[in-house]
Every structure is written in C-alpha cells, then in structure tokens.
C-alpha cells in the first residue's frame, strides 16, 4: 500500500534513485495505491547525468510493494521493497531497462512494455 509521502525505490535506468509519492491518481478520495496503480511522484534522489533531475515531478507506476497482494486464485504475493517505474504521458517507461522482478498484474493493467523489459515476472 502506497500513500502520500511514501518513499519508493526506482526500478529503471531513468537516473532517479528514490521518489516520493505526492498523489495517488484515480478518484478524488483515493488514499492508497497498490501494484499497477499510477501515482504522481517527486524525484528525491537522482544521478548527476540522469534523464530526470532532483525536484522534478513525474508520473510512475507501482511495480513492487511490501504489502501483500491477493490474487484471484487465493495466493498472495509480496516483495522486499516498494518500487516504481517512471512513465511518460503515454504510459511508456522513461528508462530503457527495468531492474528486479515485477508482478504479473501489470500486464492486465496494460503496462506490457514494462513487463517485457523486466528480467522476471512473478
């Protein structure tokens, strides 16, 4: 569960290392985001030669959460960290590589490019 002020790792090579959730998109009273949800983030830590700079505001999709996610078959999946991938206005990833595993639920939410770039889909 990702809410406002939550800090997340960045799982791509856009140059950002850490981001902070500023807003959860999808309704005026929406408080928490889970895997596959789009959030507005502020870049808190970035590499010097990055595509994004510290202080920039961008959109990101959550790819891993520590909170358990229940699947339709009754199983649960959880990860060791909260991570997101920065995306542009057309929901394509800004980076060209994805680091670490991502959840299968991203494919159903039409983030096929992120799933295809990921080294492992759980």
UniProtKB/Swiss-Prot annotation:
Which Gene3D superfamilies does the UniProt entry name for this protein?
Ribosomal protein L14 (2.40.150.20)
What SMART domains does this protein map onto? Ribosomal_L14 (SM01374)
MF GO annotations:
large ribosomal subunit rRNA binding; structural constituent of ribosome
Q: What Pfam families does the record tag this protein with?
A: Ribosomal_L14
Output the Gene Ontology cellular-component terms: cytosolic large ribosomal subunit
| Source domain of life | Bacteria
**What PROSITE patterns has UniProt attached to this entry?**
RIBOSOMAL_L14
rRNA-binding as a keyword?
A: yes
Q: Which InterPro entries does the entry mention? A: Ribosomal_uL14, Ribosomal_uL14_bac-type, Ribosomal_uL14_CS, Ribosomal_uL14_sf
Keywords noted in UniProt: Ribonucleoprotein, Ribosomal protein, RNA-binding, rRNA-binding
Q: GO biological process: any one?
A: translation
Its job:
Binds to 23S rRNA. Forms part of two intersubunit bridges in the 70S ribosome.
Give the family, as the similarity comment puts it.
Belongs to the universal ribosomal protein uL14 family.
PANTHER family from the xrefs? 50S/60S RIBOSOMAL PROTEIN L14/L23, LARGE RIBOSOMAL SUBUNIT PROTEIN UL14M
Q: What is the annotated quaternary arrangement, including any partners?
A: Part of the 50S ribosomal subunit. Forms a cluster with proteins L3 and L19. In the 70S ribosome, L14 and L19 interact and together make contacts with the 16S rRNA in bridges B5 and B8.
Task: Tell me what this protein is called.
Answer: Large ribosomal subunit protein uL14
Originating organism: Bdellovibrio bacteriovorus (strain ATCC 15356 / DSM 50701 / NCIMB 9529 / HD100)
Q: Could you tell me the gene encoding this protein?
A: rplN
